[in-house]
Swiss-Prot record:
Belongs to the VPS29 family. This is Vacuolar protein sorting-associated protein 29. Keywords: Protein transport, Transport. Pfam families: Metallophos_2. Component of the retromer complex which consists of VPS29, VPS26, VPS35, VPS5 and VPS17. Component of a retromer subcomplex consisting of VPS29, VPS26 and VPS35. InterPro entries: Calcineurin-like_PHP_lpxH (IPR024654), Metallo-depent_PP-like (IPR029052), Phosphodiesterase_MJ0936/Vps29 (IPR000979). It comes from Saccharomyces cerevisiae (strain ATCC 204508 / S288c) (Baker's yeast). It comes from the Eukaryota. Residues 178-187, 212-232 have a biased composition (Basic and acidic residues). GO terms for biological process: endocytic recycling; intracellular protein transport; retrograde transport, endosome to Golgi.
Amino acid sequence: MLLLALSDAHIPDRATDLPVKFKKLLSVPDKISQVALLGNSTKSYDFLKFVNQISNNITIVRGEFDNGHLPSTKKDKASDNSRPMEEIPMNSIIRQGALKIGCCSGYTVVPKNDPLSLLALARQLDVDILLWGGTHNVEAYTLEGKFFVNPGSCTGAFNTDWPIVFDVEDSDEAVTSEVDKPTKENQSEDDDAKGGSTGKEQPGSYTPKEGTAGERENENESNVKPENQFKEDEVDMSDSDINGSNSPSFCLLDIQGNTCTLYIYLYVNGEVKVDKVVYEKE
């Protein structure tokens, strides 16, 4: 059984469509048994129509930017034209073979994307595999016998809470060391205050330096630092790092008995790359 996991399409707010190569890969009829939409993927009718063509067995969970309700696929008996509204659940469970698969968007997990919080949710749902979205980044790891999979954003939409890491501890240590370290000026002032009659210069006194005016001018020029020394180092950042966008990705789970083979599809530089991870229930 093949289970397709899609998340965070954000169509039409942040993206227009799936990559063309993704659509060609997923357009094979009668190949994928079920589709899981893990949030932020219900605002585009064309996208939902395409997903329904992949498989009419679709599990949808509510994302942070989804509406609370979605038109039902079943027509209302009282009226042939209207369709009742169905509430989109926060969590859902899929049972395939010997495995139970939990689905959630992940924005209700606090702290967000925290492995221990996700483990607590997996235990609460009593599932072997937990699929979650909301971060726009692909992740797959095993924790205490449970398998955690995040398919990323299928369109590569930008993430508003894209993390930026600063080395705060290192900078604090550097500042502390500079503050604690006595400067030469402070040492000289202390020596002058203690010197008294030792023949050292007193505050406010001035003793002209020996040498010609030309020598003194050359010495002053040598002490001037070049302008290039004050320029900051240029940081090499890609466009995706600047605008917070991500590489489009999705996951395909091949479930056979108590074994799950995960295929991770990444769209990088116009090419589709595939990684494989195998999980077996203990």
